[in-house]
Amino acid sequence: MGGCFSKKEYQADGNGYRSAPTAYHTVTDQSYEKSSQRSQPQAQPQPQVQQTGPSLKPRQVHRPESNTILGKPFEDIRGKYTLGKELGRGQFGCVYQCTENSSGQLYACKSILKRKLVSKNDKEDIKREIQILQHLSGQPNIVEFKGVFEDRQSVHLVMELCAGGELFDRIIAQGHYSERAAATICRQIVNVVHVCHFMGVMHRDLKPENFLLSSKDKDAMLKATDFGLSVFIEEGKVYRNIVGSAYYVAPEVLRRSYGKEIDIWSAGVILYILLSGVPPFWAENEKGIFDAILEGVIDFESEPWPSVSNSAKDLVRKMLTQDPRRRITSAQVLDHPWMREGGEASDKPIDSAVLSRMKQFRAMNKLKQLALKVIAESLSEEEIKGLKSMFANMDTDKSGTITYEELKSGLARLGSKLSEVEVQQLMDAADVDGNGTIDYLEFITATMHRHKLESYEHQAFQYFDKDNSGFITKDELESAMKEYGMGDEATIKDIISEVDSDNDGRINYDEFCAMMRRARNRRKLFSVSLTS
C-alpha cells in the first residue's frame, strides 16, 4: 500500500508510471493466494542402454533459471534497449526512459527488483499484470505494452512513453475549463472501462493518477497506465477483497461483495471531481470517507453545482447509484446525451474555483507520506526488532501487508476483545494511503512510541532542511520530492501553500509538526491498542 509506484510506503508517482504494480503488496483475490500441493510420484530408475554406435553430441536445451519469475530463460534488455534518464523511483525499483536500439523510438521501462517480490502472491501478481497488459495492448486509451525482459536481478516492463504528464496537471495548467472538456476526458476514461469489461477485465483501481496524456500536444490522447490491481473477470464469482483508493471505492467493495460495476462508480467519482474540483465523499480520515460512501448522499447544492447542467448531474447520479444492479453500464454512459460527441455538454467555462480546489486536492498528503517514509527508513534494526516480529506474526499470508482479517485475528491472539467497528477504526488510523491494507512502513510509524516518533519528526524535518536554516524552502522541497519521483513544480507550490500557515513561502518546523500531528492523532489509537 501507499508505495512509490506500488501500494506500499507512499504514493510517489514518477511521471505516472509505477516501478511495481499496485497489487504486489495489497489484498489480492483469494484464488491467487494458495494452491494445493500434490505429492509427485517417485521417478522410476531408467534401464541402462549399451551404446553401440558413435557417441552423439547431446542436444542443448535452454531451461529457465531456477529463480525465474516468468518461467523462461533470462534475456538482457540491453540487447534491444538503452536505458536513459530516471523518471521515477520507488521501493520496488525504478522507471526509466529507454530507447529502442533498432528504431531510436522512446519508451518507458519499469524495472522491478526481484528480491523485493518476496511471496508467491507477489510473483503471481506481476505475472497477472503482464498478462492483462498484453491482453489489452493496442486498444484505445490504454498504454501500449511493448515487451517484458527478465534477468537475474530484475523484471523489466517496456511500454509506451506517455510524455504529456498527469490529467489534473494539464487541466490546471490550461487555466480554463468547460463541461465539454470534462465530457471529452470522461468519455476516454469510460472507454477504458468499456474495453476492459468487453475483454473480460475488471480494473478495480480507477483514479486520475492512473491516467497519463500520450504527449504534450493539445489534443493528446488519455491513456490508462496502471493495471496492478486488475483481474480477469470470472463469471458468477463474487469478489470480496477490499482494494482500490479511498475516495474512489464503490460501496459494494466496502460491503465485500462486488463485480465489474465498481469501475463505473470510480469513473463517476472522477467525473464529479472534474465538474466540481472535489470528491463527492469527503472526510478527515478514511473511516469518514467510507461512512460517507455507504451513506451515499451526493452534494449537488454547493458551488459550482447550481451552474452545472442538469444533464451532467443526471449522468453523475446514474454512475453513482448505490445499487450496482441499477447502476448505468459503460455502454449506457457512452450513449448518454451529455457524454456523446457533439452532445449536450456546454462549452461555457466552469467556475475557476473548481481548478483551485482541484489543485489543493491533488497536493494533499504528498509531503506527509514522504515524511513518514523518511522516518521509517531512519530507524535502526534494534529499535524496530519487536515491531518487525509483530508485523510478521500478523501478516499470516506473508504478502507484505496486513489486511482487516489479519489485523482482527492478530489482535485476538494478543488477547484483545475489540469489536469489529473498533478494529476497523484501528485499520483506518494506520492506513495512511487508504488502500485498505497496512504495509510495513505504515505499521512501524503507527506503532512506534509517540515520543520516539516525535523525535524522528525533527530528523525528518532536517532531511528536507538541507542548509539547516530552520525552514524548508521551495528548492529544498523540490530536491527531496524529485529524488523520489514525487512531484513537479506545480505540486510543490501547492504543498507549500497548504502547509505554510503564515504565508511566508517556506515551511517552518512548527508548520511541519502541525501537518504530521494531524496524521499522528489518527494513529495514536492504533499504537495504544497494540502495545497496551
From Swiss-Prot:
Residues 1-71 are annotated as: Disordered. It is found in: Membrane. Its EC number is 2.7.11.1. This is Calcium-dependent protein kinase. It catalyses: L-seryl-[protein] + ATP = O-phospho-L-seryl-[protein] + ADP + H(+); L-threonyl-[protein] + ATP = O-phospho-L-threonyl-[protein] + ADP + H(+). Ca(2+) 2 binds at D431, D433, N435, T437, E442. It comes from Daucus carota (Wild carrot). Ca(2+) 3 binds at D465, D467, S469, E476. There are 3 contiguous domains conserved in the CDPK subfamily: a kinase domain, an autoinhibitory (junction) domain and a calmodulin-like domain. The autoinhibitory domain (345-375) inactivates kinase activity under calcium-free conditions. The active site is at D205. The keyword tRNA-binding does not apply. Residues 1-11 have a biased composition (Basic and acidic residues). GO terms for cellular component: membrane. Residues 382-417, 418-453, 459-486, 487-522 form the EF-hand domain. GO terms for molecular function: ATP binding; calcium ion binding; protein serine kinase activity; protein serine/threonine kinase activity. Keywords: ATP-binding, Calcium, Kinase, Lipoprotein, Membrane, Metal-binding, Myristate, Nucleotide-binding, Phosphoprotein, Repeat, Serine/threonine-protein kinase, Transferase. Belongs to the protein kinase superfamily. Ser/Thr protein kinase family. CDPK subfamily. Residues 81-339 form the Protein kinase domain. May play a role in signal transduction pathways that involve calcium as a second messenger. A lipid is attached at G2 (N-myristoyl glycine). Residues 37-55 have a biased composition (Low complexity). ATP binds at L87, G88, R89, G90, Q91, F92, G93, C94, V95, K110.
